[in-house]
Amino acid sequence: MQLFKERRVLTVSALTALVRGLLEENFEQVWVEGEISNLACPQSGHCYFTLKDVGAQIRCVMFRGAFRSLKFTPRDGMRILTRGRLTLFEPRGEYQLVADYLEPQGIGGLQMAFIQLKEKLAKEGLFSELHKREIPKLPRRIGVVTSPTGAAIRDILTVLNRRFTNVELLISPVRVQGDGAAREIADAIDDLNRVGNLDVMIVGRGGGSLEDLWAFNEEVVARAIHRSKVPVISAVGHEIDFTIADFVADLRAATPSAAAEIVVASKKELTAEVEALTHRLHVSQQRRLERSRALVTALSRAITDPSRFLGHLAQRVDSLDARLTREAGLILDDASERIVTLTARLSRQTPALTLKRWEERLATLSLRLDHAMTRRLAVAAESIGLATGTLNAVSPLATLSRGYSITRKLPARSVVTSSRQLAPGDRVEVSFAAGSALCTVEQAHKDSDSLTAPPRSV
């Protein structure tokens, strides 16, 4: 310091250089806490800000390399702990702190970076349920992005071998921690999408510290998951660990083993489910078949035995005829009795006038009797005509008379309604309006073929 006691004139540059040397020699590394203000990060990649407290402030600079290594984004008003060295910016004669490390006060840098990135991606909609895709129930090809030597891949293989072995596994090996791991993971996700024909993808690793899992909190991984065309299941760490990848993925699994359990169903459980469904289907088919058989039997009886229906109509005609005969007889008997009575009364009265009056009355009664008999007979004839018309309308014989026939399969004589009931060599009986014929089936056509195929004999 003797230099300053002697009268030695220094230039501004020399003095500034001297002060700079003193600062850099005595303050190689200092830790300073304060509040960020006037933050500016131009295109050069360097970051400039002021660190202040209630009594003073100091200019700071963080060069591009150090700034890029930060896990969080500094903002004005944020209280931070800064590490760096003091120097002097000679053009302005201002001393400044060249920072190489920043840490938010009250919360770790990684945690701050996690919160900031989560807020950013949430605003962009990357976590929205609208983007979530359904995980296929029975995937055939599964892609896995993880370390080839870690516990995660061993756990996944163990679960797959235990639950269902008929799946194809495509592993894309990557580093899951350290510098460059995030980029490798993102590239692997893109590569598996380019491979194609994948049904689902598992992206993950085993447990670890926040620093160990940090690659899955990087923005590059989140965006790779979001643009993936293949549904992605994130399986990072243990059940209590949450990463940005978990929020972007279509589904989060607590562990890699849990992810394998989700994508691959148990073969034993599937077999039991198929057996149960098969049994239910068999029971349902049996019930429908029984109902169909009962209906066919009832219809067959009605068609194969028309005499029952005809007999019912014949009984009705006989009943009407007997009723008509009975009522006509009653009318005649009543008239005969009245004639006898009148004849007796007439025989007791000799005057010609009385005789003439009774003759006229007798004629009137005879005429009324004729009219009554005519009306009764007309009504009876009309009833018989209606019954006969109904009988002819429903009679299979009337249908047969128009050129149709009834085919019965022998020996059961069941009525054939479809060609699917017949097979070559079957014996059938064909009934016509007059007579019947025994035939042998040479060929049976499907229902659709019968409309276009040329007629063939059976």
From Swiss-Prot:
Q: Name one GO biological process term.
A: DNA catabolic process
Annotated catalysed reactions: Exonucleolytic cleavage in either 5'- to 3'- or 3'- to 5'-direction to yield nucleoside 5'-phosphates
Chief localisation class: cytoplasm
Q: Which GO terms describe its cellular component?
A: cytoplasm; exodeoxyribonuclease VII complex
Q: What class does this enzyme belong to in the EC scheme?
A: hydrolase
Keywords associated with the record = Cytoplasm, Exonuclease, Hydrolase, Nuclease
Question: Its quaternary structure?
Answer: Heterooligomer composed of large and small subunits.
Protein name from the UniProt record: Exodeoxyribonuclease 7 large subunit
**MF annotations from Gene Ontology:** exodeoxyribonuclease VII activity; nucleic acid binding
| EC numbers | 3.1.11.6
Give the protein family. Belongs to the XseA family.
User: Tell me, what does this protein do in biology?
Assistant: Bidirectionally degrades single-stranded DNA into large acid-insoluble oligonucleotides, which are then degraded further into small acid-soluble oligonucleotides.
Q: Which organism is it from?
A: Citrifermentans bemidjiense (strain ATCC BAA-1014 / DSM 16622 / JCM 12645 / Bem)
Question: What Pfam families does its record include?
Answer: Exonuc_VII_L, tRNA_anti_2
